[in-house]
């Protein structure tokens, strides 16, 4: 899964954002185990997943603040 584009995230509904965050957190969990057991080949994916989560949370906060 490639890094998420900002435009794609902005087009998401709040429920879709929550689902995306949940799936990315599960992916990070699995990546941590792969790293611990020496099976992780693409180490940069851990960084991408962490930043995707932050990107989604940032845009969600911006949308929430814009409604006020």
UniProtKB/Swiss-Prot annotation:
Gene3D superfamilies in UniProt: 1.10.287.310
GO CC field: cytosolic large ribosomal subunit
Keywords (A to Z) from UniProt: Ribonucleoprotein, Ribosomal protein
Matching Pfam families: Ribosomal_L29
One GO MF term attached to the UniProt entry: structural constituent of ribosome
GO terms of biological process kind: translation
Annotated NCBIfam families: L29
Record-stated family: Belongs to the universal ribosomal protein uL29 family.
Protein name as annotated: Large ribosomal subunit protein uL29
Species whose genome carries this gene: Nitrobacter winogradskyi (strain ATCC 25391 / DSM 10237 / CIP 104748 / NCIMB 11846 / Nb-255)
Lineage: Bacteria, Pseudomonadati, Pseudomonadota, Alphaproteobacteria, Hyphomicrobiales
């Amino acid at each position: 899964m490639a890094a998420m584009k900002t435009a794609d995230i902005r087009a998401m509904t709040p429920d879709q954002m929550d689902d995306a965050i949940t799936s990315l957190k599960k992916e990070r969990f699995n990546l941590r185990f792969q790293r611990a057991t020496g099976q992780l080949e693409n180490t940069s994916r851990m960084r991408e997943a962490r930043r995707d989560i932050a990107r989604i949370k940032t845009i969600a906060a911006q949308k929430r603040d814009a409604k006020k």
